[in-house]
Amino acid sequence: MMSKLGVLLTICLLLFPLFALPQDGDQPADRPAERMQDDISSEQNPLLEKRVGERCCKNGKRGCGRWCRDHSRCCGRR
């Protein structure tokens, strides 16, 4: 009887951590499409617009990406 309980306890202790811990596929970093759907980018957030504009201007014309050209005066916005 005790050996059966020991075997059952050993099996439970070995199997439980394998299922209780998150697997690698469950991490948000492994699912970029889902992560990007929930992400609020700085392009859509007016609170971050000033900081992004400052970063564009610090880099001069070299740092002018598409967003900077559309939103920053130093990159050609009128």
UniProtKB/Swiss-Prot annotation:
- Where located? Secreted
The signal peptide, as residue positions, is 1-22
The segments labelled Disordered in the record are 26-46
Q: What happens on changing residue 54 to A?
A: 13-fold increase in blocking SCN3A (K(d) is 15 nM)
Q: Which GO terms describe its cellular component?
A: extracellular region
Q: Does the keyword Transcription regulation apply?
A: no
Q: What is the effect of changing residue 53 to A?
A: Mutated into D-Ala. 40-fold increase in blocking SCN3A (K(d) is 4.8 nM)
- Cystine residue pairs: 56-68, 57-74, 64-75
Reported tissue expression: Expressed by the venom duct.
Q: Please note every region of biased composition (Basic and acidic residues).
A: 28-38
Q: Which UniProt keywords apply?
A: Amidation, Cleavage on pair of basic residues, Disulfide bond, Ion channel impairing toxin, Neurotoxin, Secreted, Signal, Toxin, Voltage-gated sodium channel impairing toxin
Cysteine amide: residues bearing it: 75
Residue stretch(es) of the prosequence: 23-51
Q: Which GO terms fall under molecular function for this chain's record? A: ion channel inhibitor activity; sodium channel regulator activity; toxin activity
What Pfam families does this protein's entry cite? Answer: Conotoxin
UniProt free text on domains = The cysteine framework is III (CC-C-C-CC).
**What is the role of the protein in this entry?**
Mu-conotoxins block voltage-gated sodium channels (Nav). This synthetic toxin potently blocks rNav1.4/SCN4A (Kd=0.34-3.6 nM), rNav1.2/SCN2A (Kd=13 nM), rNav1.3/SCN3A (Kd=200 nM), rNav1.1/SCN1A (Kd=360 nM), mNav1.6/SCN8A (IC(50)=1.8 uM), rNav1.5/SCN5A (IC(50)=9 uM), rNav1.6/SCN8A (IC(50)>30 uM). It is noteworthy that the toxin is 50-fold more potent on mouse Nav1.6 than on rat Nav1.6. The block of SCN4A is very slowly reversible.
Q: Note on file? A: Negative results: does not or very weakly inhibits rNav1.7 and rNav1.8.
Q: Which family does it belong to?
A: Belongs to the conotoxin M superfamily.
Q: What is this protein called?
A: Mu-conotoxin BuIIIB
